[in-house]
């Protein structure tokens, strides 16, 4: 007997529960469910948001959003930890109060556990590459590192891995820079 898995769509994603403490993501028609992120994850994410928003206050070139629903295709809807889109992208990326399409930068903060690590490092990396996300960061609170990937011909290539004693800059947000240790400050 051959059983075929149903390919899920954005309509299925929209019908899933909200506010139950889980994250529901559909990647190429397959459902991924994860728990809400832990405290360290949230502190690192809050630090990143603060640093980037501080830069954007004096350089209003775009918008940063945490934990948005991002519809990439009819069979892929994800909830990245952070998304940045430029002002000139707003009309094409914001549709009916949701993000659709290709933002300038996507950031995932890795949560502990092999399934989480595999999803951010393999599954989402492949998804973001296939849909031409220009820049993707994987932030690892455990090792206090940030991997910066850039898109080249629908492949995300590891540009650099930064440690806590290094300086972070990005092509996605011109003029932005910070010391990596600022991202990993606990309180």
Provide a role label for each language-model segment.
Residues 1-187:
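Gly/Pro/Ser/Thr-rich low-complexity, intrinsically disordered segments predominantly at protein N-termini
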